[in-house]
């Protein structure tokens, strides 16, 4: 039987190596954990430094930039960034075709040029204002030229104000766009010393900036065109609707009409004379008399009151607007009552002379034998 002491010694010798091996495994695990913690701490410090860049002053940023540029590992960093970019960056098209101009922007430009707001000369627009003013007159020479000149001057003044505001805002837009573009280009050139940036990429970024700013330019031109159209509708279009003839021209035409109430059909010579005095065309004189005869027939009572009013003016004194007045001692049909509706010499249905009316078309004048004498 073996000695117990020897057995204990033998057992202790065999247990010793096992205890040593367990202690070595624990040390390796602790070393790996420490390396992992140190690595995470380094990453956290790097992220903290990156986050603090926005809070740095300009002097601190310049100092760190200088330190980076002078670092001995900067070429290696730039080389690694180039390799990463070649693997991950999207390829830029080699053929960068220019985009066609925006059709809406072209329409706005054409309208601004036509109205005299835009163009090579910032003080232009006189021709557009003159043509618009001429169109508002309907091709006729108005007697109240002073009023027209005042309205045209107001229109030109408002148009000049719109043009001035447009060019001021356009200059601000161009200045802001150029400043922002220059800032981005300088920033990209500065960053190209650290990370790879090609000139084509800078040019593409400039195009993106200009495209973003073009929406502001379109809004400016759109609002300017709307202002010009509102100005035209207020001054020229409204004026064209409300002013067919001046007050003086209406006086001349009404006086002739009621002075020749028995035969309100002026001859061609009389039409030419009336057109010359009123500053309108012969066709406008003919249209006015046609409309006047229709209104007279529809409302004979009111027309008779108007005729008596002109007769009173005639009795008070000769009007400076009248045609050649009758010689002294002769009667005038101004005070005569209105002829019956069947003797006006026209019918509403046929649009011409009635063969049974007291107007002799074959003689081209008035037949006194067929008409009742209306003289007092």
Curated annotation (Swiss-Prot):
Stretches for region PBC-A: 45-124
Membrane-spanning residues: none
Matches recorded under CDD domains: homeodomain (cd00086)
Region (PBC-B), start-end ranges: 127-237
Comp. bias intervals (Polar residues): 20-34
Compartment(s): Nucleus
Keyword set includes Transcription regulation: yes
Region (Disordered): 16-35, 318-376
GO cellular component, one term: nucleus
Quaternary data: Interacts with Ubx and hth.
Protein origin, superkingdom: Eukaryota
GO terms of molecular function: cis-regulatory region sequence-specific DNA binding; DNA binding; DNA-binding transcription factor activity; DNA-binding transcription factor activity, RNA polymerase II-specific
Compositional bias segments (type: Low complexity): 318-335
Family recorded in the similarity comment: Belongs to the TALE/PBX homeobox family.
Biological process (GO), any one: anatomical structure formation involved in morphogenesis
The protein's name: Homeobox protein extradenticle
PROSITE patterns listed in its UniProt record: HOMEOBOX_1 (PS00027), HOMEOBOX_2 (PS50071), PBC (PS51978)
Phylogenetic lineage: Eukaryota, Metazoa, Ecdysozoa, Arthropoda, Hexapoda
DNA-binding region, residues: 238-300
Domain annotation PBC: ranges: 38-237
Keyword line: Developmental protein, DNA-binding, Homeobox, Nucleus, Transcription, Transcription regulation
Function according to Swiss-Prot or TrEMBL: Transcription factor which acts with the selector homeodomain proteins altering the regulation of downstream target genes such as wingless (wg), teashirt (tsh) and decapentaplegic (dpp), thus affecting segmental identity. Delimits the eye field and prevent inappropriate eye development. Required for proper localization of chordotonal organs within the peripheral nervous system.
InterPro entries named in the record: HD, Homeobox_CS, Homeodomain-like_sf, KN_HD, PBX_PBC_dom, TALE_homeobox
């Amino acid at each position: 039987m073996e000695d117990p002491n020897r057995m204990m010694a033998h057992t202790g010798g065999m247990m010793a190596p096992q205890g040593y091996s367990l202690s070595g495994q624990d040390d390796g695990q602790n070393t790996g954990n420490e390396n992992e913690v140190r690595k995470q701490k380094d990453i956290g410090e790097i992220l903290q430094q990156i986050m603090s860049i926005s809070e740095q002053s300009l002097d601190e940023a310049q100092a760190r930039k200088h330190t980076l540029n002078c670092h001995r590992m900067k070429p290696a960093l730039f080389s690694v960034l180039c390799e990463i970019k070649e693997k991950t960056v999207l390829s830029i098209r080699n053929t960068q075709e220019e985009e066609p101009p925006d059709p809406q922007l072209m329409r706005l430009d054409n309208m601004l040029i036509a109205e005299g707001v835009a163009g090579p000369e910032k003080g232009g627009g006189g021709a557009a204002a003159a043509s618009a003013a001429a169109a508002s007159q309907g091709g006729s020479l108005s007697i109240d030229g002073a009023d027209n000149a005042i309205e045209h001057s107001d229109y030109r003044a408002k148009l000049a104000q719109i043009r001035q505001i447009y060019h001021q805002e356009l200059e601000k837009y161009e200045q802001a766009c150029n400043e922002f573009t220059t800032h981005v280009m300088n920033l990209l050139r500065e960053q190209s010393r650290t990370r790879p940036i090609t000139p084509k990429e800078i040019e593409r970024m400039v195009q993106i900036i200009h495209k973003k700013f073009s929406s502001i330019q379109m809004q400016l031109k759109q609002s300017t065109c709307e202002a010009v159209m509102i100005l035209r509708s207020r001054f020229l279009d409204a004026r064209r609707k409300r002013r067919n003839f001046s007050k003086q021209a209406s006086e001349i035409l009404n006086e002739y009409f009621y002075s020749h109430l028995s035969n309100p059909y002026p001859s061609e010579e009389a039409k030419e004379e009336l057109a010359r005095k009123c500053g309108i065309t012969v066709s406008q004189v003919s249209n006015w008399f046609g409309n006047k005869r229709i209104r007279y027939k529809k409302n004979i009572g009111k027309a008779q009151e108007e005729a008596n009013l002109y007769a009173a003016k005639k009795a008070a004194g000769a009007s400076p607007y009248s045609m050649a007045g009758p010689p002294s001692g002769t009667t005038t049909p101004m005070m005569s009552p209105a002829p019956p509706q069947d003797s006006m010499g026209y019918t509403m249905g046929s649009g011409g002379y009635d063969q049974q009316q007291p107007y002799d078309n074959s003689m081209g004048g008035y037949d006194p034998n067929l008409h009742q004498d209306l003289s007092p």
